């Protein structure tokens, strides 16, 4: 994990990125950044203790509903992107599609529907680049 930390730290420094914790303080900071009109990137494939249960590669797993909830409450767009490691070892970040939350009413059904779109996108990208994705945790843990 040492080299991963170095990459993260270099990206933070180069692009003035702020990483927030998955706790109440981090959530409060995230909402403040959001209200201030800042762009927000969420790494929504992290292991969660809470969330909604969805199918991912044919198995049930917990998935964060935060991207869908934020988008529905604000009417903002969700851009689905993926970092691709190139042959020279550098990464290129590609954005493939967007979800226009303003097309949906703010309901729990639509939180699930948007979350399913996001997770289907993850599945498609992992299938396309399986050698570039690795979980460091038990992804299908439901408790």
Language model segments and positions:
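Short acidic-hydrophobic, aromatic-tinged amphipathic segments that line or gate anion-handling sites
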Residues: 18-22
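Non-catalytic C-terminal accessory region of glycerolipid acyltransferases
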Residues: 24-143
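Short, small-residue-biased leader/transition segments that mark boundaries at the very start
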Residues: 1-7
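Membrane-proximal helix-turn-helix segments that form the acceptor-binding/catalytic region
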Residues: 8, 12-16
């Amino acid at each position: 994990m040492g080299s991963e930390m170095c990459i993260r730290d270099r990206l933070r420094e180069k692009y003035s990125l702020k990483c927030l914790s998955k706790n109440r303080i981090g959530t409060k900071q995230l909402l403040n950044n959001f209200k201030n009109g800042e762009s927000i990137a969420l790494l929504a494939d992290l292991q969660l203790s809470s969330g909604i249960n969805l199918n991912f590669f044919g198995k049930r797993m917990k998935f964060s509903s935060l991207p869908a909830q934020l988008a529905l409450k604000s009417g903002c767009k969700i851009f689905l992107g993926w970092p691709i490691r190139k042959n020279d070892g550098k990464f290129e970040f590609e954005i493939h599609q967007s979800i226009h939350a303003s097309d949906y009413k703010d309901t729990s059904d639509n939180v699930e529907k948007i979350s399913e779109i996001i997770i289907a996108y993850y599945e498609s990208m992992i299938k396309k680049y399986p050698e570039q994705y690795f979980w460091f945790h038990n992804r299908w843990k439901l408790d």
